[in-house]
Design a protein with these regions (language model features):
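N-terminal alpha-helical targeting/anchoring segments
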Residues: 1-134, 152, 156
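TRNA-recognition modules of translation machinery and tRNA-sensing kinases, especially anticodon-binding
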Residues: 26, 129-422
């Protein structure tokens, strides 16, 4: 969440940076400043009136002690009049404060100076590519055909149990999921990340703290009876471990990893985008999260990008890294790198990870702070990334490694899967 002081002291710069994200309501910045002015005015009026009441009450006490009842009574009338204005002032202050908070949470995070201009995914900048695109033999098929051929996922039964977009993994398909999750977690923990198994539902405060609410209200599954939300990513519960927390500077950086199922409504998707495992409502993902000092957060971002890149190299998958343009960035992000893997049978790039620096946007919302060397309270910076999201990784592993008598698996998965081939 942006701070009013930032908007007030850097108004034009804030508007320019919001324009990079193509934010449609730049006038909201002026509205927020005006609401803050009104809040301060009302607070000053309330404090002045309350001070008069307090001072007069003391004076009444003195007069009564001196036997000056008549003088005390005359002041009581003034006190009564002042007190009658306090309650309406409180109510007006509460309304203005609510209007201020409702307005400020609509503002997205400000983009870093490194964010390229642009509106659509076509404007994202390819930073680098790696791996070798496979040359498939004639007759190679997309993963949705391979899934049927090798009986790995049952979409029809999943749809019967729940609905479309809820796949039922079975046999070697389920085993491959488990192997990937275990490998990803081992890879992350060996790099110093502490593993967590978080709750897969969160309350409203947690969803607000990481920026899912109110921005993604309609994209999340909401259990209204208890006002809980199914998580769209492990980022939400794991980052909230440090909500309302003051950490010691020597504990930073805090490195966390977690596996979770993820639930997303994904309304509006159609066509090739939703074939097979390309886009589903429930999927598995392993996440990495770091909390660190502000001056180190962009070095940490580079470290996390390299971490995910090396993981993809071990899977022997062709990939590319993109720096997202302003129009394609997430609401909470200051800078995001996307990883895409080449799907040889579909002849297209599929996103498998996003790695983002949120700077202090999330930590202001969740009140995650630390004391610096001078004993001054500072807001930490938070970062997260997918390491990795499974469905499209599975799709590309199946497609890119298909041979006449099965599907070859990368060497790093052999001991986890128990075999070199499906």
């Amino acid at each position: 969440m942006l701070q009013v002081s930032v908007l007030r002291n850097n108004t034009e710069d804030v508007k320019k940076r919001l324009a990079v994200k193509h934010f449609a309501q730049p006038e909201l910045v002026d509205t927020i400043i005006a609401l803050d002015d009104e809040r301060k005015r009302l607070q000053a009026e309330f404090d002045t009136t309350q001070a008069r009441v307090n001072a007069a009450s003391k004076e009444i006490g003195k007069m009564m002690a001196q036997g000056n009842k008549e003088g005390a009574e005359s002041i009581k009338a003034d006190v009564g009049n002042w007190k009658t204005t306090l309650e309406p002032l409180k109510e007006e202050m509460a309304k203005v404060e609510k209007d201020l908070q409702d307005a400020i949470v609509i503002l997205p995070n400000l983009p870093s100076a490194q964010v390229p201009e642009g509106r659509t995914p076509e404007d994202n900048v390819v930073v680098r590519e790696g791996g070798i695109k496979p040359v498939l033999s004639e007759g190679a098929v997309p993963h949705w055909d391979l899934i049927t051929q090798y009986d790995l996922v049952d979409f029809e039964t999943g749809a019967k149990i729940t609905g479309r977009g809820f796949p039922l993994y079975k046999g070697k398909g389920a085993k491959l999921q488990r192997a990937l999750v275990q490998y990803f977690l081992d890879y992350n923990t060996e790099a110093g990340y502490t593993e967590y198994i978080p709750p897969f539902m969160v309350n409203e405060a947690s969803a607000f703290a990481t920026g899912q609410l109110p921005d993604k209200e309609g994209q999340m599954y909401h259990a209204t009876a208890d006002n809980f939300y199914l998580i769209p990513t492990a980022e939400v519960p794991v980052t909230n471990i440090y909500r309302d927390t003051i950490v010691k500077q020597e504990e930073l950086p805090i490195k966390m990893t977690a596996y979770s199922p993820c639930f997303r409504r994904e309304a509006g998707s159609f066509g090739k985008d939703v074939r097979g495992l390309n886009r589903v409502h429930q999927f598995e993902k392993v996440e990495i999260i770091q909390i660190t000092e502000p001056e180190k957060s962009y070095d940490v971002l580079d470290e996390m990008v390299k971490h995910v890149e090396k993981l993809l190299l071990t899977l022997e998958l062709p990939y590319r890294i993109l720096r997202l343009c302003g129009g394609d960035m997430g609401f909470t992000s200051a800078l995001t790198y996307d990883f895409e893997v080449f799907s040889a049978a579909q002849e297209r790039w599929l996103e498998v990870s996003s790695v983002s620096n949120f700077e202090s946007y999330q930590t202001h919302r969740m009140k995650c702070r630390y004391k610096d060397a001078d004993g001054k309270m500072q807001f930490a910076h938070s970062l997260n990334g997918s390491s990795l999201a499974l469905p499209r990784i599975v799709a590309c592993l199946l497609e890119n490694n298909q041979v006449a008598d099965g599907i070859n698996l990368p060497e790093v998965l052999h001991r986890y899967f128990g075999s070199a081939k499906i």
